[in-house]
């Protein structure tokens, strides 16, 4: 879209965010945060994690220690792009090496003596192999161990080795706000987690729980399993902060409702009673006694002083380097929230709110794995040293332990859908279309097991915290993922930050806070606590909070702190806190700034004239107070106006209540929803269904499909959509196409296109309309001896193989053809046989219903021969294939009509597709009609006044009235043909045409809606789903049809189908289908005495039960199905006796004859 199509300033500013910003290093906005996350991990974070120096073991009161040091960490990313990697045939990944030194430190009078135990210099380039966003496999296609056919230059893209398959961004389990829970009436808990900052490695986690029972206020304790003592929360706060109980009372009661003040007084009084119950109470002695009791309880091998230091020093790891007094004031602030939340739960962020969670991006996945595997690696070394010392008396390490850090296996498991050992599996996502390459990395969801374990059923609802940051339309409509996966809106991203940047930013913020007068930031009794990533740094004078937050936001926008994504949240509503967030994993998006009741875009008139030549980073630099990056925490506790139009309609006093203003509605959708048109003009469910169908649309992949041995469906003749949105254009979804323009007619056609049925023109199909090509990977593993077996096999399945045992290039595979030689030979134990060796074919066959051409063959020779075959097939639309518009008007091909059968207009043009007209009324998709009208108007005037092509802007969610679009179409037609009459102009605008009956050549009485639209073909194809068959494979046990279409399975003809035929009186058909044909009937002998199935011993049938009792059984032969016999046998094996009994009635030929009276009738 060109410049002159945008008129509103807020819309133009939103568009500036979507386009690339090379000055800020943003070349592709939708996935920029993923690229930054991964590059930060590879270039910086991995080096920090692997650089380790710490003790493994300690002896003799810590005077002797076994130390480990990992140094010389070298991470080598590739010097070329993924495309160059493909041309070179290289793998696009990063390699890491390091050196491990293990030595013994002994503390002597002269100093510390060091004795080397073992070392390993990791020179192997594959010691740690980190897959990047794209993985090109097999190193070099010319390698003799692995060969390709055709053997040409070009890498082979293997999707399973790519990080693209990782899938959605998971929501962290740890919450940044404490979790409030009602255990039972009058019993509550307040749980929170403390995580060490990123510069502290290894990362320390502590989880605490504050319990409060109204009936036992003395037991208002804080506890943590094995990491902290169980102690009264008020007394702990007093111990750490060194203040009186009256100070704590005043701090908790300040600015609280009366009901909360009453509870505060009760808790403080209970703490006083607890202290008075102990003779000569001293807070230090009380805490020391609890620590000693915990030391005895845990049977710790540490000394009491070491145990106490370990417990209290590591209390609240996120405030590790903070004085204990600040830790005490932090506990008081937590207790304030807890007590307030008991009475006003709805005002506190619940556990399902996105305010409470951070999000794991792709780089964070691998960072977490690197942490865990490094600890496992060091633990294995420690255990090996202990075992060697125990068994041999020496401190030594096996070289195998040093050379297997285990990171490669963990990374491979991640790409297979295994994140952590304790978290179970999650679904991986192969990316088959350009739209999925964007939508999946921008999806946010929960752990699959997280919902089950935590019983978090409420997360399935659309949470208010997701508003503006998540797309409300692109959510799963069915299945286990409903409500658990959300799509980011086009303006949303996830923050990333380096450790060095984190420390510098924290230092600058602390210096800014301490620049205030000392007394103003030391209001610990009645002030507002200021926290940086939940770490308390100061407490501000309540009279200065507004000025502080306003000044902080202004300095942030001006670049004073060097980071524009800092979040500052002013939490009022009696909880009284100023939260400053700087960490990674936060959701952020831009907002328009409102300062003192003025929209800053209105205060900067020169911005409009310069906007066209500026990037988004230029706007942030030269006009810093126009736009602010706001995280979801700050947004939740700020006053945000819905739109600029509503803001300008308010009075001056109302405007001063707002802090921010949102962009137009189109920026609240995700990229998938942006591919739709006018969803606000349709019914609500159409948006959700439309997003699901758009992701199933067949598009054109950018990677080389001939070199990519992977499944995929590709549109052969794609067209760029005419009616688009800015997000669709900037994300390159429009340029990479996902459909074609077709001419549709909304009408009934001979009763064929009922419901979702559509009529498609035969000549349109023959010209390549919506034609696709299917690329499919077939992979088989063959034992090496079977592959090299040269025995002849008479099987017709080998007719497409060459002499090397592989399928020929350009061969057309049919169902039953083998893709590689797999002949198994067996020797018979028969001395009299002339040829006692037999061979038989065990190869896997091609099972698809359609023929495919062999495009590429790859072989990997190891202990087994792995053969990968890439087949291609052009597939034109057939009956049963699914199509849809971008307004969720799906249709299934019901009839393929010849052009002579279709109605035509005055120019002889026939529709390509006929859609049932009643579907518009039932599904209320008005925007589909608007799309047709706009597309037709574009065809009349495709260029603007400067001669440039201009697509039509029709965003997915827009605030433009339908009349405005009608006026646009009217101007297009008046410009191209100014002599049109009013009726002709109206018909042109509303795409109404008179069509002629092909049989009578007479016009229809009513006009028909007739025009072009962008039509999508879905990946639901008939030949991929068909499973019904008459003959095929069966299982060995019950001889039923196999399950699954890929295994040649079919649909079982069972009881319900039988009942249908019985109802129609088809007794013979039932017998043939159920017994003779499908289930293989079998003769069975039944004992009439006991009802058992007779056993066959040396070709003699006998009843085992009766023979043991010396009875003479009477065996009766019946015919039944094989599966019935298997069922009875299995039931008997489980101790369940099923007796087959016979109906006792005399046969008809033994019945006495009726008496016949032979007397003449006249004598009677």
From Swiss-Prot:
Keywords: DNA-directed RNA polymerase, Metal-binding, Nucleotidyltransferase, Transcription, Transferase, Virion. It comes from the Viruses. It comes from Monkeypox virus (strain Zaire-96-I-16) (MPX). One of its GO terms (biological process) is DNA-templated transcription. It is found in: Virion. Part of the DNA-dependent RNA polymerase which catalyzes the transcription of viral DNA into RNA using the four ribonucleoside triphosphates as substrates. Responsible for the transcription of early, intermediate and late genes. DNA-dependent RNA polymerase associates with the early transcription factor (ETF), itself composed of D6 and A7, thereby allowing the early genes transcription. Late transcription, and probably also intermediate transcription, require newly synthesized RNA polymerase. Belongs to the RNA polymerase beta chain family. This is DNA-directed RNA polymerase 132 kDa polypeptide. The DNA-dependent RNA polymerase used for intermediate and late genes expression consists of eight subunits (147) kDa, (133) kDa, (35) kDa, (30) kDa, (22) kDa, (19) kDa, (18) kDa and (7) kDa totalling more than 500 kDa in mass. The same holoenzyme, with the addition of the transcription-specificity factor RAP94, is used for early gene expression. Pfam families: RNA_pol_Rpb2_3, RNA_pol_Rpb2_5, RNA_pol_Rpb2_6, RNA_pol_Rpb2_7, rpo132. The gene is RPO132. SUPFAM superfamilies: beta and beta-prime subunits of DNA dependent RNA-polymerase (SSF64484). Its EC number is 2.7.7.6.
